[in-house]
């Protein structure tokens, strides 16, 4: 209900438009088209986990183009039917987010791609975020290395999520709500390969990557 209300309320879309018209012109000089290193931009973020309003997604994509973005656009969602059907557009590249079962996830992604395109994991979850009061999440390196090798052998592209664990300043960390309020800590450590202050944490993952 919240998603429907947010999408259908015109003053919210007006606010989004105003924000994009302020934000995107600042990024355009950094885009590849203008000699920068931004080669692609994402439309929404895992929208299929919350809604399926295609008109809203089209609005966001068209707004980005209207603001001067010429780079590749893509959507990023979980590798499940409801998420990929709800969060994607037919003429825009789709990538999937996951931390395991890479082969199965890419097969599901191809069912929705609609055109020939490279396989990409937008968020490869090599770790996980922490809520206040919880034990720090730590993922064993072996399954991370195994999935990494599978993706490299298949020729897929991926982003580590996270490669460097930075900081969520102020109240930007966000929260979840699973029967109770679960605020996220200000550290975005996420059991990343590089921790919050830049130290290396997973010495056995990088040699595996270099072998390819």
Features from the language model and the residues they span:
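N-terminal, Lys/Arg-enriched amphipathic/low-complexity engagement segments
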Residues: 77, 94-97
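Non-membrane alpha-helical structural segments and their capping/turn regions in soluble enzymes
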Residues: 10-17, 54, 138-145, 205
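Conserved, mostly hydrophobic/aromatic
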Residues: 23, 41, 123, 161, ...
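Active-site neighborhood of glycoside hydrolase catalytic domains
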Residues: 11-90
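Catalytic cores of eukaryotic secretory-pathway lumenal/extracellular enzymes that build
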Residues: 2-10
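Catalytic cores of secreted or luminal carbohydrate-active enzymes
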Residues: 187, 191-212
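Aromatic- and acidic-residue-enriched segments that line the glycan-binding/catalytic groove
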Residues: 1-3, 57-62, 89-95, 137, ...
């Amino acid at each position: 209900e919240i998603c429907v209300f947010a999408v259908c309320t015109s003053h919210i879309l007006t606010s989004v438009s105003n924000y994009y018209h302020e934000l995107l012109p600042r990024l355009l000089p950094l885009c590849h088209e203008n000699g920068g290193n931004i080669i692609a931009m994402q439309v929404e973020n895992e929208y299929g986990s919350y809604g399926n309003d295609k008109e809203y997604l089209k609005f966001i994509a068209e707004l980005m183009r209207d603001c001067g973005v010429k780079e590749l656009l893509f959507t990023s969602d979980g590798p499940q039917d409801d998420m990929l059907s709800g969060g994607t557009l037919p003429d825009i590249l789709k990538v999937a987010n996951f931390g395991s079962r890479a082969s199965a996830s890419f097969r599901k992604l191809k069912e929705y791609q609609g055109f020939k395109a490279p396989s990409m994991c937008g968020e490869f979850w090599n770790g996980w975020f922490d809520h206040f009061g919880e034990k720090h999440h730590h993922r064993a390196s072996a399954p991370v290395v195994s999935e990494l090798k599978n993706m490299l052998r298949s020729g897929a592209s991926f982003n580590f999520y996270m490669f460097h664990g930075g900081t969520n300043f102020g109240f930007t960390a966000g929260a979840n709500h699973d029967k109770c309020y679960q605020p996220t800590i200000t550290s975005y450590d996420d059991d990343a390969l590089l921790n919050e202050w830049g130290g290396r944490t997973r010495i056995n993952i990088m040699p595996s990557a270099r072998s390819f």
